[in-house]
Amino acid sequence: MSVIDFHSHILPGIDDGSRNVETSIGMLRMCREQGVDIMIATPHFYADSNRVERFVENRKNAYDKVMAENADIPHIMMGAEVAFFDGISRAERVDALTIEGTNIMLLEMPFVTWSDSVVHEVRDLIEKRHFHIILAHIERFLKIPGNKSYVEQVLELPVTVQVNAETLLDFRQKGRMFKMFRNGTAHIIGSDCHGMHHRVPNLWLGREALSKKLGEDFVKQIDTY
């Protein structure tokens, strides 16, 4: 079984994550030391400020710079953290933003109160476009005023729910997250790492916290998800 970090910003100079190759290599070495086998590189994609073709080109260039260092780092798979936008379920090129070789899309939901149309868009991504949707850092959307019923509707869809590792260390949030993992409404962990000194690679801390609370076998199940 491979240990996978499903959410990271380790590619240099492409978003608000790593600023340069040196930082990227440092982050990736930290991940290797923590036992991570596969890093899903998920730079931010915002449809209102980027074209898919240009994004994919920039992502490939950033990846090539990292690989040119020939460092001992985890295997990197290309993906994106796709910010929700109106019409996403009808956008023609979003298939290029899935995790390479799969139909899996890491989707960042709106940071405002959702709506029926948002729920319908997610449903259409699944049912009409046949994407497997991972909801990025679900914990950030649970406390948005008026969001409870919409979150519940989305969680009733066949989605995978990702939780940031740091949330499992936060005394204000970890109880709810452990409960979600226990009842099957949260499924995987991501570090959402952005740098060497801020929002650092910390997948192992989240895995350790989950293991202490729910058991080592439970964490191993995540690795087979």
Task: Give the positions of each predicted feature.
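An N-terminally biased module of ancient metal coordination in phosphate/nucleic-acid-related enzymes
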Residues: 1-72
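Active-site neighborhood of phospho(di)ester-bond hydrolases with catalytic His/Asp-centered motifs
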Residues: 4-6, 39-42, 77-81, 134-136, ...
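Non-catalytic positions within long, well-ordered alpha-helices that form the structural scaffold/packing
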Residues: 32, 126-127, 181-182
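Active-site environment of divalent metal-dependent phosphoester hydrolases
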Residues: 46-49, 83-85, 140-144, 168-171, ...
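Extended substrate/RNA-proximal surfaces in nucleic-acid metabolism proteins
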Residues: 50-162
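Short acidic/histidine-rich active-site segments
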Residues: 185-201
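Mid-to-C-terminal alpha-helical segments outside catalytic/metal-binding sites
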Residues: 203-225
